[in-house]
C-alpha cells in the first residue's frame, strides 16, 4: 500500500543515506585508496628521512673537529666558548648620515666626507631637558684608545668599539672580528692615521679611529623623521643616511632614569635580508647610556664595565634533522588540502549531471540533502586525517608524536568542517567538473607554495605587524598553514604543543578564525544555494515569516481580468475556451484540477544586442486527475521552457501555475513531494542497479517495508526490466532503451499526483514502445500527466487531449478526433504514373473535386487535398478504375487526414501569421 502522505525529513534522509551507502559500497576501493593516501605520503617522508640520516652520518664525523673550531652547521662541541668584546653596529662610511636636500639639520657633516671616507658616526639625543642631554652626550665616548695586552678585555671595555659587519646568529664567533676587517674606536675626535694593532686570540686585526657625533633634536617626532628618512626607502632620492642609535631621555633627572633607545632592526630582519635571523648589537648601546648617566651622577670614575660577550658551553650537535618538522607545513598543507578537490568535484558532478535536481523533483528536500552529504564528507575527512596522524605516529614521525593528540584532533576537525563548508560554497558558483578541478588543484598547490615562501617568512619576521598576520590568516589556506607551522616548531623543539601553549603559539587565534569562518561559510553557502540554485527570493528567510498560506487560491483583480481581454480575440475558439475555463476555476477557488496554468509567461532577457525572447506567451491550461495532456510543437516552440517552469528548473517571468492547489512560485518544495518526472535525458547513477534506483525513489515517495518491495517488483516487471535479473545489473550496462524505461518507472513509482514525461519512448523498439505506452496508460488513472512528444502515434494512443505549441503559445487544443475534424476537412489523394500522363491525372482529380489543391509533385507522383464536402469515395474509385484503362497507374491511394497533417498545417499557419505580424 502506497503511503499518500509526503515523506518526512528523516524518511528523506534515510533514503538518501541508504542510496549513498550503496553507491559508496560499489566504490569501496576508491574510498580505501583515498584513505590510504596519507600512508603512502608518510612512507615517502620516512624514505627521505632515512636517506637524509645516512648523509648526515658522514657529515657528523667528530674526527674533523679540532679544539674549539666548529664545522659548518655548528656540530662540534665547544666546551670553552670565546669571550668577545661588545661592539656597536655602525654604518659603512658611504652610508653615514650627512647633509642632504631632504635633511635640513645644519649640525650634520657635509656629504663630501663620503668621498674621503672621513664621515663620523652619529647618535641622536632628545628629551625633556636639553642640559641633561648635553651632559650625557658628553659622557658617551672615550677620548682615546687605551688597551693592555696582558689584561685585554677589561681594558678594551673602557673603549667604545664598533663594527660595520652585522653580528652572527650566536656569540660563539663574531663576523666583525676578522683579519681583513678593521674594528673602529669611536671617539669625539680623531687625529690623522689613528690606527692601532690588536690581537684577539689567533686573529690579528687593526683598530681605526672614527669620530662620533652626539646631536640634539627637539623631540621624538624629529628623531623618528630623521631615522625614517635615513633609510633609502624613506626618502625620494633613495639615498641612505644611517644613524648608529638614538636616545629619548624623556623625564630623566637625578632621581629618575627613563630612556627609550632606537636601533636599526633590519640587520636581523630575515624577511628583508633573505638570510637567517641574526643578533643585533643593542647591549652596548644600553651600556653606553647607563654609564653616561652614572658619570653624570657620580663623576667620571663611575661606570659599569661591560667586558665581554660569551655563549654557554655547547655539546656536540647531533645531525639528525627531523624531515617531517622541516617540511611539515608545506608537505602537510598539501596533504590536508588534497581532500578539497575531491569534495568539490563530487558536489559539482551532481550539479553537472543534474542528479541533485532530479532527486529534488522527486521529493528530496534541501535539508536532508545537505545533512547527509555533509555527514558523508565529514566522515571521509576525519578518516583521512586519522589515517594521516595514525600512520605518521606509527612510523615514528615526531611531528605527530610530540604534539598533543587532542589538540591535533580539534585542529583537524575544525579545518575539515571549514573545508567542507567552503566546498559547498564554491560548488554553488561552478557547474563544470573540469573547470572546478583545475581551479581546485591550483588553489591546493598555490596555497602551499605561497605559505612556504611568503607567509612563513612573515610569521618568522619579528618586525612584521601581527595585524597583517591575522589578516592573512583569514584566508583558510593560510590559517591551515599557520597551524601546521606551529606544530612543526613545537615538535622540533622537543616538547611538542600542549593546551597551555595555545595563547603563546598563535594557535588560539587560528582556532577562533577557522571556527567563525566554518559557520559563516556554511551559512553563506546555504543562502547562495537557496537563492541561485533553488530560485528563492533573496529575502526568503524573511518572507517565510510573514507570508500567508499559499495554498489558498488568489482571486484575480478587476485590473488583471481587463488586461486579459486584450488577447482573447487573437486566440482560436478552443484556446479561448481553455482560458475562460481556467479563469472561472480560479475565480471560484476550485482546487479540483491537478494542474492549473494561469497566464504563465517566460521571457529570456536579450543578449548581444538581440531583443528579449518570449518563450511562453501567457499560457492557460487545466489538466484534471486521470487525464494525459500531450504537448506537440516544433523545436524551439517553448515546450521545454514550459516543462522547466512546471518542474522548478525555471522561475516564471509572470503568471503562475497551481499543482494540487500549490503555487509553483511559492511552494515548489511541497509540489515536489507529489510529482514524478521523466526528463528528456536519462539522469541515472551508472553503478547503481535499476532496483536500487527504484528503492531510493520509492523511499522518497514514503513507501516502506513490504509495500516498497512490492512497488519495486511491479515497476521492474511493468517496464520489462525484471526477467533475467536485468533489474539487478548496473544502469551503466543498460542500453539506451532500457535506461529510458527505467526513467519512466522512476517517474511513476509511488503513484505521484502529477507526472511530466518528456519524450518517454525515445530510442525504444516498437514492441517496447507499445508495452511502455500501456504502462503509462494504466498509471494515469489517478494521475495527471503532461507529455511532450514528436511521435503522433504516441500522442494519439496516450493523450486524452492535445495542444499544439508554436512560438510560445497554444494554437489549438482538443482531443485528436476534434483536431482532425477541425483542421483536416479533406482527403489526401496520391497517384503515381509516368511523367507524360501527369496532366491526365490532374483532369481526373478535377473531375471528382473541382476545388482540389495540389500539395506535392515529384517525378510522376502527385498529391492533392480533396475537400470532404464535395467528394464521394465511390466516385473516386470509379474514376481511378476508368483511368487505368487509358494509362498505366503505378500506385494510388486515398487517405483521411492524419494528426501529423494537422500538426504541420497548424504549425505552418501559425508561423506564417507570426512572420506577417
Curated annotation (Swiss-Prot):
Residues at which ATP binds: 633-640
Entry keyword Aminoacyl-tRNA synthetase: no
Domain called ABC transporter: residue spans: 595-832
GO cellular component: membrane
GO molecular function per UniProt: ABC-type transporter activity; ATP binding; ATP hydrolysis activity
Sequence intervals crossing the membrane: 34-54, 323-343, 377-397, 409-429, 435-455, 508-528
Location within or outside the cell: Membrane
Keywords: ATP-binding, Membrane, Nucleotide-binding, Transmembrane, Transmembrane helix, Transport
SMART domains: AAA
Membrane topology value: Multi-pass membrane protein
Gene3D superfamilies: P-loop containing nucleotide triphosphate hydrolases
Family, as annotated: Belongs to the ABC transporter superfamily. ABCA family. CPR flippase (TC 3.A.1.211) subfamily.
Protein name: ABC transporter A family member 12
Species for this entry: Arabidopsis thaliana
Amino acid at each position: 500500500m502506497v503511503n499518500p502522505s509526503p515523506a518526512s525529513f528523516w524518511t528523506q534522509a534515510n533514503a538518501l543515506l541508504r542510496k549513498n551507502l550503496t553507491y559508496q559500497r560499489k566504490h569501496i576501493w576508491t574510498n580505501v585508496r583515498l584513505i590510504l593516501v596519507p600512508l603512502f605520503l608518510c612512507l615517502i617522508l620516512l624514505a627521505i628521512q632515512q636517506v637524509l640520516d645516512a648523509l648526515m652520518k658522514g657529515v657528523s664525523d667528530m674526527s674533523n673537529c679540532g679544539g674549539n673550531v666548529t664545522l659548518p652547521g655548528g656540530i662540534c662541541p665547544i666546551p670553552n666558548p670565546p669571550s668577545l668584546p661588545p661592539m656597536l653596529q655602525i654604518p659603512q662610511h658611504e652610508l653615514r648620515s650627512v647633509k642632504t636636500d631632504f635633511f635640513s639639520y645644519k649640525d650634520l657633516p657635509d656629504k663630501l666626507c663620503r668621498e674621503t671616507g672621513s664621515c663620523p658616526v652619529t647618535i641622536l639625543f632628545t628629551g625633556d631637558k636639553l642640559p641633561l642631554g648635553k651632559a650625557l652626550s658628553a659622557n658617551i665616548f672615550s677620548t682615546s684608545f687605551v688597551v693592555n695586552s696582558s689584561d685585554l678585555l677589561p681594558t678594551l671595555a673602557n673603549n667604545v668599539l664598533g663594527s660595520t659587519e652585522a653580528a652572527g646568529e650566536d656569540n660563539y664567533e663574531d663576523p666583525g672580528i676578522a683579519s681583513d676587517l678593521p674594528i673602529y674606536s669611536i671617539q669625539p675626535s680623531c687625529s690623522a692615521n689613528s690606527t692601532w694593532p690588536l690581537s684577539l686570540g689567533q686573529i690579528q686585526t687593526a683598530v681605526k679611529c672614527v669620530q662620533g657625533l652626539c646631536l640634539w633634536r627637539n623631540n621624538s617626532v624629529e628623531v623618528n623623521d630623521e631615522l625614517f628618512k635615513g633609510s633609502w626607502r624613506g626618502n625620494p632620492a633613495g639615498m641612505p643616511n644611517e644613524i648608529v642609535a638614538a636616545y629619548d631621555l624623556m623625564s630623566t633627572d637625578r632621581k629618575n632614569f627613563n630612556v627609550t633607545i632606537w636601533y636599526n632592526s633590519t640587520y636581523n630582519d630575515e624577511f628583508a635580508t633573505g638570510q637567517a635571523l641574526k643578533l643585533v648589537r643593542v647591549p652596548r648601546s644600553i651600556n653606553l647610556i647607563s654609564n653616561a648617566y652614572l658619570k653624570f651622577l657620580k663623576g667620571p670614575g663611575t661606570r659599569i664595565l661591560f667586558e665581554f660577550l660569551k655563549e654557554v658551553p655547547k655539546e656536540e650537535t647531533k645531525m639528525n634533522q627531523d624531515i617531517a618538522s622541516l617540511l611539515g607545513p608545506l608537505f602537510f598543507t598539501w596533504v590536508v588540502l588534497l581532500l578539497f578537490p575531491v569534495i568539490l568535484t563530487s558536489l559539482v558532478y551532481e550539479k553537472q549531471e543534474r542528479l541533485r535536481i532530479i532527486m529534488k523533483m522527486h521529493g528530496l528536500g534541501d535539508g536532508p540533502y545537505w545533512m547527509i552529504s555533509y555527514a558523508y564528507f565529514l566522515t571521509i575527512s576525519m578518516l583521512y586525517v586519522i589515517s594521516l596522524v595514525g600512520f605518521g605516529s606509527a612510523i615514528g614521525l615526531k611531528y605527530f608524536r610530540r604534539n598533543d593528540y587532542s589538540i591535533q584532533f580539534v585542529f583537524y576537525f575544525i579545518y575539515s568542517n571549514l573545508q567542507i563548508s567552503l566546498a559547498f560554497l564554491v560548488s554553488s558558483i561552478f557547474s563544470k567538473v573540469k573547470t572546478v578541478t583545475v581551479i581546485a588543484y591550483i588553489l591546493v598547490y598555490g596555497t602551499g607554495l605561497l605559505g612556504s615562501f611568503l607567509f612563513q617568512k612573515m610569521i618568522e619576521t619579528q618586525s612584521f605587524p601581527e595585524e597583517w598576520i591575522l589578516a592573512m590568516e583569514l584566508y583558510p589556506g593560510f590559517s591551515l598553514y599557520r597551524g601546521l607551522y606551529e606544530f612543526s616548531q613545537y615538535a622540533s623543539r622537543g616538547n611538542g604543543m600542549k593546551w597551555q601553549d595555545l595563547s603563546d603559539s598563535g594557535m588560539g587565534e587560528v582556532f577562533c578564525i577557522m571556527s567563525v569562518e566554518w559557520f559563516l561559510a556554511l551559512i553563506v553557502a546555504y543562502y547562495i544555494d537557496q537563492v541561485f540554485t533553488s530560485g528563492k527570493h533573496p529575502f526568503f528567510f524573511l518572507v517565510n515569516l510573514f507570508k500567508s498560506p499559499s495554498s489558498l487560491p488568489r482571486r484575480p483583480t478587476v485590473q488583471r481580468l481587463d488586461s486579459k481581454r486584450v488577447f482573447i480575440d487573437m486566440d482560436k475558439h478552443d484556446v479561448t475556451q481553455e482560458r475562460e475555463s481556467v479563469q472561472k476555476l480560479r475565480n471560484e477557488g476550485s482546487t479540483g484540477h491537478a494542474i492549473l496554468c494561469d497566464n504563465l509567461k517566460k521571457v529570456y532577457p536579450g543578449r548581444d544586442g538581440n531583443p528579449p525572447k518570449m518563450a511562453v506567451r501567457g499560457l492557460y491550461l487545466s489538466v484534471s486527475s486521470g487525464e494525459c495532456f500531450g504537448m506537440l510543437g516544433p523545436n524551439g516552440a517553448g515546450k521545454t521552457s514550459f516543462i522547466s517552469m512546471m518542474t522548478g528548473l525555471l522561475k516564471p517571468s509572470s503568471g503562475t501555475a497551481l499543482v494540487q492547489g500549490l503555487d509553483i512560485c511559492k511552494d515548489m518544495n511541497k509540489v515536489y513531494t507529489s510529482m514524478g518526472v521523466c526528463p528528456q535525458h536519462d539522469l541515472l547513477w551508472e553503478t547503481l542497479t535499476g532496483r536500487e534506483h527504484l528503492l531510493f525513489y520509492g523511499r522518497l515517495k514514503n513507501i516502506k517495508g513490504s509495500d516498497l518491495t512490492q512497488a519495486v517488483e511491479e515497476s521492474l516487471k511493468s517496464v520489462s526490466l525484471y526477467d533475467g535479473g536485468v533489474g539487478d545489473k548496473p544502469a551503466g550496462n543498460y542500453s539506451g532503451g532500457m535506461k529510458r524505461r527505467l526513467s519512466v518507472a522512476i517517474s511513476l513509482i509511488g503513484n505521484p499526483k502529477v507526472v511530466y514525461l518528456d519524450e518517454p519512448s525515445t530510442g525504444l523498439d516498437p514492441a517496447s514502445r507499445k508495452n511502455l505506452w500501456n504502462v503509462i496508460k494504466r498509471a494515469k488513472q489517478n494521475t495527471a500527466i503532461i507529455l511532450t512528444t514528436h511521435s503522433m502515434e504516441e500522442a494519439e494512443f496516450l493523450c486524452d487531449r492535445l495542444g499544439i505549441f508554436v512560438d510560445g503559445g497554444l494554437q489549438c487544443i482538443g482531443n485528436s478526433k476534434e483536431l482532425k475534424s477541425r483542421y483536416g476537412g479533406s482527403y489526401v489523394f496520391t497517384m503515381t504514373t509516368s511523367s507524360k500522363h501527369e496532366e491526365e491525372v490532374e483532369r481526373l482529380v478535377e473531375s471528382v473535386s473541382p476545388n482540389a489543391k495540389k500539395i506535392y509533385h515529384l517525378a510522376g507522383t502527385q498529391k492533392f487535398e480533396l475537400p470532404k464536402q464535395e467528394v464521394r469515395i465511390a466516385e473516386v474509385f470509379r474514376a481511378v478504375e476508368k483511368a487505368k484503362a487509358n494509362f498505366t497507374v503505378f500506385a494510388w491511394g486515398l487517405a483521411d487526414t492524419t494528426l501529423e497533417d494537422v500538426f504541420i498545417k497548424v504549425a505552418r499557419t501559425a508561423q506564417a501569421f507570426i512572420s506577417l505580424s
